[in-house]
């Protein structure tokens, strides 16, 4: 029986084989590089956006509840809120302020240009009270007053980025041919929906968009000292009694953050799954390379076996070699993926998309490298197993 090779000898053989065919090795790992690059950049940006949204939601305050007329995000509401539901919520013990209104999208005109923005309308004093600690701060001008009619507050992006000429406080914009004077401009919030927005008084908004007496969002603040979870459950009971079903969502800031994060998480996993196809292509490339390498080195295998190397030693040499190919591809892909994520973050921030952030952690780095190594090992295992079983006498004869 032969003597087993040392671990460092196995690693040396594997490295030597890779170095001897550098060009072939580089071509082999391209698929792994592309797959890891795509996965790292997408995971980094996906979790970066989730973390940003979670932080922003938590800034809303631990005493705020958001109520939406649908059970799941992205599903059209089967019915809308009315004054009946508003009254039912106001009567719930522990409720302090109830702010209600409508959000949607519309076209606005300024200086002959037309652009699409998101719009919100609500009672101005209630809006200020509910969102006073949530980053909705005035950069220039003032907030809307309850008696303002054809006046508006616009988002940072609407004022500074959308039009060729910046909108100033006092300028006039048009919505559905109605003129509105800009009385205030919000500070930059970091997401396009809020930054590219316009806020109107509820009295004007209802008539302008034809939604009188109907509302697609309600925000509630809970009195100090009250249990927000208990108040949330009481609101659910009141709405169920009013609606007759449970086709609505009552979410605290933490629940809202978790819900949005879970939706984004599913999207991230799907996109990463698509990117993983490149890794599969890379794995096939490594497998083919190892198969060709074994055919080319039949005599080397025969010599090693004749010198006493065991079948497990030959298997280990080729498995380690394929594992290192996967690892090298993973390292290159990881570095390029991080750089790509950082570049996208910088460009997004320059364009005003502050929610786009690159999230890099040691868990991601170590996980990607281990995964890449395992992909290489698995890809090379079956060709290596067939090579390890070769008969040394036949290989030395060149058969």
From Swiss-Prot:
Protein's cellular compartments: Cell membrane
Keyword Transport: yes
Molecular function terms from GO: transmembrane transporter activity
Transmembrane stretches, start-end: 26-46, 266-286, 301-321, 324-344, 358-378
Major subcellular location class: membrane
Signal peptide: none
One Pfam family of this chain: FtsX
Keywords assigned: Cell membrane, Membrane, Transmembrane, Transmembrane helix, Transport
Membrane-related topology note: Multi-pass membrane protein
InterPro entries named in the record: ABC3_permease_C (IPR003838), MacB_PCD (IPR025857), Macrolide_Exporter_MacB (IPR050250)
Glycoprotein keyword on record: no
Cellular component, GO annotation: plasma membrane
Family the entry assigns: Belongs to the ABC-4 integral membrane protein family.
Protein name: Uncharacterized ABC transporter permease MJ1507
Organism per entry: Methanocaldococcus jannaschii (strain ATCC 43067 / DSM 2661 / JAL-1 / JCM 10045 / NBRC 100440)
